[in-house]
């Protein structure tokens, strides 16, 4: 019998970002209790030698599994040191991979406070709007006009430490152009 390969999408992430993600998950599971239903599996709980950790997030009947890997093939850049993350949605025997934005939306649907359906009406009538949205990462694109109006009216609290975001975990911070402020342009470089 020949070998069968299974391909998975693994987002390349640097080690420090994975460590930050793990500590945020553990904090909100054990201290703040906002993610108390989540399950954290250490590397020694897995049979796979490349798995660093797994976070199982129940979403109703389904489970979102965020797996971190180590010892992977290094990337084309020096800082791609063989660390990665995969995001999988499981329900019974069905499994599929999801992107980080969708993962954050799925997490936000089941966990962390957001504006209630009656928040717009309450805001128009001048009543106190409660609860406020705690998980900004769950709204990955420009929201509805009502959501934008509510966020302008009720500023979200800055949480210390922040809630764990999958999109923030896999964000590519290496290939973004550097933003420099307060520096004048080099006239010799611009040809002026």
UniProtKB/Swiss-Prot annotation:
Residues 171-172 are annotated as: Membrane association. It is found in: Host cytoplasm; Host cell membrane; Virion. Residues 151-164 are annotated as: Multimerization. Induction: Expressed late during infection in a Rev-dependent manner. Residues 182-192 have a biased composition (Basic and acidic residues). This is Virion infectivity factor. The gene is vif. Residues 54-72 are annotated as: Interaction with host APOBEC3F and APOBEC3G. Residues 40-44 are annotated as: Interaction with host APOBEC3G. The BC-like-box motif mediates the interaction with elongin BC complex. The HCCH motif (H-x(5)-C-x(18)-C-x(5)-H) mediates the interaction with CUL5. A motif (BC-box-like motif) lies at residues 144-153. The lineage of its organism: Viruses, Riboviria, Pararnavirae, Artverviricota, Revtraviricetes. Vif-defective viruses show catastrophic failure in reverse transcription due to APOBEC-induced mutations that initiate a DNA base repair pathway and compromise the structural integrity of the ssDNA. In the absence of Vif, the virion is morphologically abnormal. HIV-1 lineages are divided in three main groups, M (for Major), O (for Outlier), and N (for New, or Non-M, Non-O). The vast majority of strains found worldwide belong to the group M. Group O seems to be endemic to and largely confined to Cameroon and neighboring countries in West Central Africa, where these viruses represent a small minority of HIV-1 strains. The group N is represented by a limited number of isolates from Cameroonian persons. The group M is further subdivided in 9 clades or subtypes (A to D, F to H, J and K). InterPro entries: Vif. Pfam families: Vif. A motif (HCCH motif) lies at residues 108-139. The record marks 150-151 as: Cleavage in virion (by viral protease). GO terms for biological process: viral life cycle.
């Amino acid at each position: 019998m020949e070998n069968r390969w299974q391909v998975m999408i693994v987002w390349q992430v640097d080690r420090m970002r994975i460590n930050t993600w793990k500590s945020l998950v553990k904090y909100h599971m054990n201290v703040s209790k906002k993610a108390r239903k989540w399950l954290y599996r250490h590397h020694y709980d897995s049979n796979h030698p490349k798995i660093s950790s797994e976070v199982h997030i129940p979403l109703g009947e389904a489970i979102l599994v965020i797996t971190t890997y180590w010892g992977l093939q290094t990337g084309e850049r020096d800082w791609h040191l063989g660390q990665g993350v995969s995001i999988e949605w499981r329900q019974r025997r069905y499994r599929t991979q999801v992107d980080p934005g969708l993962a954050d939306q799925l997490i936000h649907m089941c966990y962390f406070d957001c504006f209630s359906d009656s928040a717009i009406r309450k805001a128009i009538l001048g009543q106190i709007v409660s609860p406020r949205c705690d998980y900004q990462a769950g709204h990955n694109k420009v929201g509805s006009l009502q959501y934008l109006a509510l966020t302008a009216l009720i500023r979200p609290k800055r949480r210390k430490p922040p809630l764990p975001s999958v999109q923030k975990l896999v964000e590519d911070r290496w290939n973004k152009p550097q933003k420099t402020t307060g520096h004048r342009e080099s006239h010799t470089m611009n040809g002026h």
